[in-house]
Amino acid sequence: AKKVVISCAVTGSIHTPSLSPNFPATPDQIIQQAVDAYKAGAAVLHIHARNQEGKPVGDFETFGYILSNIKKQCPEAVIGITTGGANGMSTEERFSIIEYFKPEMASANAGSMNFSYHKLLDDVKEVRYDWEKEYVTRTYDNVFKNTFKDIEYCIRTMNASGTLPEYEVFDL
């Protein structure tokens, strides 16, 4: 029999709370979904942090709360964290999370790309939070920047932190 490793990204940084009532938007919802995924068989939990309004964030306090609570309940799970952060974060902000938490795994993006989801909320009748519309529409004029210099910095930071890369390739 083949062995399979299941990795679960509980939430990414693209979708917003208004897109689904089932979306794990708050830190506690993210924690619960991660624990549920682990109990269902996920060995790797890929984590993005969000604040109480469901907005993607990269602050250490929110990330620390989420990571520590998942690890308490799932001590055997491999926890990987995003270096994609949230749209609008600087390269330094995105990678500082590795140096601070020294996670087992973290995403290593293999290149830059045009990453637009500006029409995501067009068919949503009621947007729950003020931040959502601007968050998605600004991607129309946005590049998800991962230059060779950024990638090298990311890998060096991971090596120094003992973090394994989870390579993410978006465009082939």
Predicted regions: what they are:
Residues I30, A37, H48, A106:
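Conserved, mostly hydrophobic/aromatic
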Residues A9-S13, R50-Q52, T82-A86, N109-M113, ...:
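Active-site beta-loop-alpha junctions enriched in small/polar residues
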Residues G88, F95-L172:
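Conserved anion-binding
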Residues S18, A43-I66:
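Glycine-rich, proline-tolerant flexible connector loops at the mouths of alpha/beta enzymes
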Residues A1-N22, V124-W131:
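N-terminal small/glycine-rich loop or linker at the start of catalytic domains
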Residues K3-A9, V44-H46, E76-G80, P103-S107, ...:
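Structural preference for beta-strand elements that scaffold enzyme active sites
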Residues V10-Q32, T82-T91, Y140-K145, E166:
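Active-site mouth loops of central-metabolism enzymes
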Residues C8, P56-I81, C154-A160:
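Alpha-helix-loop-beta-strand connector modules within alpha/beta enzyme cores
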